[in-house]
A protein has these predicted regions:
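Short amphipathic alpha-helix used as the core "switch/output" element in two-component signaling
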Residues: 41, 63-75
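CheY-like receiver
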Residues: 121-150
Length: 150
């Protein structure tokens, strides 16, 4: 099975390294970015299953990056990471396309990893469902075309 790819976007190098290390130990392939623009460039040239996005980046707000990513890579799972755990931040992030919301510092490593795994599992289920629906449509269409040829 192919490794899931995760992009960690945070201007704090120690947080990027810590998250990358934790996720790599779980078997994920991890890439990092320090700015929103760097993240956008990486998503243009690489495929990622999931992005963890700090809410405050040096060149843009994490919620602005959410909107950009929603337009350029809509299928990527987007999780906002924040040291500012306020309800209005969570609501704003979800309204702009976040699939999840994690507060830092991350105290419960197992809980953090479980959230990542759950989001990736849901993504897999959604992809399988979509593939099944496409296959059903193609099969149905072939039968319709075959019936016309008879």
């Amino acid at each position: 099975m192919e490794k899931k790819r995760i992009l960690v976007i945070d201007d704090d190098e120690s947080i990027r390294k810590l998250m990358a290390h934790m996720l790599e130990l779980e078997g994920y392939q991890v890439d990092t970015a320090a700015t929103g623009n760097e993240a956008i460039q990486k998503t243009k040239s690489n495929f990622y299953n999931l992005a963890i996005i700090d809410i405050r980046l040096p060149d843009m707000e994490g919620t602005a990056l959410l909107t950009l990513m929603q337009d350029t890579v809509p299928k990527i799972v987007k999780i906002i990471l924040t040291g500012y755990p306020a309800l209005n931040n969570a609501i704003d992030a979800v309204n702009k396309g976040a699939d999840g919301y994690i507060t830092k510092p991350i105290i419960d490593n197992a809980g953090f990893l479980r959230k990542i795994k759950d989001h990736l599992r849901k993504q897999d289920e959604s992809n399988r469902y979509n593939e099944e629906k496409v296959a059903e449509f193609v099969e149905s269409r072939i039968k319709q075309l075959d019936a016309k040829d008879v």
